[in-house]
Amino acid sequence: MFLRTESLKQYVRLYPVTTVLICIHLVVLGLMEWTGSSQDSRTLLRFGALFDLPGMVPEWWRYITAMFVHIGFAHLFFNSFTLYVFAPPLERMLGAWRYALLYLLCGIAGNLASAWFHSDYFISAGASGAIYGVYAAYLFLAIFRKDLIDQQTKQTVITILVIGFLQSIIVPHIDLYAHFGGFIGGLAVMGLMSLFIKRRHLRQRAELERQLQQAEQELQERQGEPE
């Protein structure tokens, strides 16, 4: 499910929301580097990072914008690559607008948790909260909709979550609260969406994703055969 074999043109056509999200990440970081530095506090705040500073209350819109801001190239690459690999199947299953809504709500949930639980000075940015919401959506489907998520995918998601949360606890300067908030948000939003999305609709989209992946793999194998 998470093996990406599409060409760039196919990827953009099949997964428009994920493509737009990654492009926004790249554009924002490029502008930050052009006008300052993506690791400079003032530049981060100017471009919408979340913060908690003495005597200041963050504007409401930062809970949205912070998920598109990244602190350095490594931060950008890791989050964007994770989106590139793991988000497409969920976008196909939910459809573009539902997936976009889930992503945004999970990112906001992560930023709200970050602001709520941090008690001292901090600046927070990145798509990690939203990404953990995507993981949570897969986990929800793996538990409650086993017809959509195979066992291997379930094990992959659980392994990533365990490693991710351990890393969030052990490695300094990683926003555990944002990850946890996004994860809880993902479970909640996916749970609500599952009540309103017809089971047949999800099943058809999941089967379509499997068929597309299989067709792409077969095409690549044929292209690799000698004439």
Where are each of the predicted segments found?
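Alpha-helical membrane-inserting segments
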Residues: 27-32, 109, 113, 117, ...
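N-terminal TM1-TM2 helical hairpin plus the immediately adjacent luminal interfacial "cap"
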Residues: 13-125, 172-174
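C-terminal ends of transmembrane helices
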Residues: 4-5, 83-91, 139-146
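Alpha-helical transmembrane bundle and helix-membrane interface signal
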Residues: 92, 140-155, 195-203
